[in-house]
């Protein structure tokens, strides 16, 4: 494996001499991370600087567009720390995020009020706020939206909060549409591209004709496996309160995700007063029709409920000698089948996170299938 380093202008700066360890985490619905530990050498100290871009070359298949261009995931260094242990060994630690974190450099302005699919909404907000249709100061340089397969989806009545975080809104629409995203780099052309996609169906009974991908210790393609089934954070019915009308009445809508009753009914409240019925379009004040506004509140409710679902997940350490190869037979975002005969469990789930660990010349791959449990920070944000 080789780690290459670039400037933000995608000018090649060199390759890392050697590393002690690398943790490379990619996520389907969220921003990935990395953590790298390397001995201090003149070359490493020169390259591992805050702000530089790193890419990982390990011989695995990357994203290739129809024009033959090769795009790969990359990360930006945001943290550098130098340590010296009791034996006098000096090491350099670098940490950072995959490039989709750049989306949070922008607030959405002007406000978007639009009816479309989640895929179209994501492309629209990216294009308007950091793409070709953004103002000259707000454009990301060397950046474009990569060609995409059209994904089937229902129409959504959407309105964002004024000056909403672009990254957070893209994440919300991606989760609602079951879409993955990232910003990729083209080293040869010195370009960046917004990548929006939907993983393949590789489940045991898929109807698309794809070769099934089944992870099980019985097939010797999994070394370790953990299973989690949690309803600790589960809600299935939400009340959404909108902004006050001129008569001070506040409309309330509900979203019912399960048609449950009795003890099975789990209710939650969401205040959506940040979604106003009136907004500015140029110099004109526009009033959203009540029926459209209520549909927007329901969209907010559906988005909120996405974070309150049952958490069912497998976390597996995949054997590097297995019959299934990462990025050849399966990839981040694909839906696969997990099977554990002894536990009596078989589920179809999406690969939502992949952790690649490189240490002492050895590689391990750990994949999360399904939804991982929310962190304490995520729970606090939800309560707020």
Model-derived segments and their meaning:
Residues 118-123, 127, 163-170, 294, ...:
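Generic alpha-helical secondary structure
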Residues 50-149:
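Surface-exposed cap/loop segments at beta↔alpha junctions
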Residues 1-17, 204-210:
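Polar/acidic, low-complexity leader/linker segments enriched in S/T/G and N/D
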Residues 1-8, 193-194, 237-239, 336:
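Short polybasic amphipathic segments
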Residues 44-60, 104-114, 204-219, 329-337, ...:
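Extended Gly/Ser/Thr-rich low-complexity repeat segments
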Residues 20-47, 168, 217-384:
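An acidic/polar, Gly/Ser/Thr-rich interaction patch typically located in mid-to-C-terminal regions
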Residues 7-11, 56-68, 242-246, 338-342:
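Short acidic, glycine-rich loop/turn motifs
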């Amino acid at each position: 494996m080789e780690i290459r380093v670039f400037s933000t202008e995608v000018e090649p700066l060199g390759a890392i001499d050697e590393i002690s360890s690398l943790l490379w985490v990619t996520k389907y619905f969220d921003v990935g991370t990395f953590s790298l530990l390397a001995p201090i050498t003149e070359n490493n100290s020169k390259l591992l600087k805050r702000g530089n871009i790193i890419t990982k070359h390990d011989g695995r298949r990357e994203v290739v567009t129809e024009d033959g261009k090769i795009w790969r995931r990359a990360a930006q260094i945001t943290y550098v720390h130098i340590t010296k242990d009791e034996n006098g060994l000096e090491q350099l630690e670098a940490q950072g995020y995959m490039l989709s974190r750049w989306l949070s450099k922008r607030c959405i302005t002007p406000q978007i009020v639009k009816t479309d699919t989640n895929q179209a909404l994501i492309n629209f907000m990216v294009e308007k706020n950091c793409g070709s249709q953004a103002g000259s100061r707000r454009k990301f340089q060397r950046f474009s939206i990569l060609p995409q397969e059209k994904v089937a989806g229902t129409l959504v009545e959407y309105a964002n909060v004024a000056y909403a975080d672009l990254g957070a809104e893209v994440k919300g629409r991606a989760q609602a549409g079951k879409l993955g995203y990232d910003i990729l780099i083209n080293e040869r052309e010195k370009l960046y591209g917004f990548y929006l996609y939907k993983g393949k169906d590789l489940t045991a009974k898929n109807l698309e004709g794809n070769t099934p991908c089944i992870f099980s210790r019985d097939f010797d393609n999994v070394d370790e496996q953990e299973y989690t089934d949690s309803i600790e954070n589960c809600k299935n019915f939400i009340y959404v309160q909108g902004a006050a009308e001129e008569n001070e009445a506040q409309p309330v809508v509900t979203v019912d995700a399960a048609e449950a009753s009795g003890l099975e009914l789990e209710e939650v409240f969401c205040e959506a007063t940040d979604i106003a019925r009136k907004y500015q379009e140029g110099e004109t004040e526009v009033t959203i029709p009540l029926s459209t506004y209520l549909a927007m509140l329901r969209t907010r409710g559906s988005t909120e409920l996405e974070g309150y679902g049952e958490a069912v997940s497998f976390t597996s350490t995949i054997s590097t000698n297995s019959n299934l190869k990462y990025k050849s037979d399966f990839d981040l975002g694909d839906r696969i089948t997990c099977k554990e005969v002894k536990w009596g469990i078989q589920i179809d789930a999406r690969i939502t996170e992949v952790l690649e660990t490189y240490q002492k010349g050895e590689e391990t791959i750990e994949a999360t299938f399904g939804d991982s449990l929310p962190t304490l920070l995520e729970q606090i944000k939800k309560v707020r």
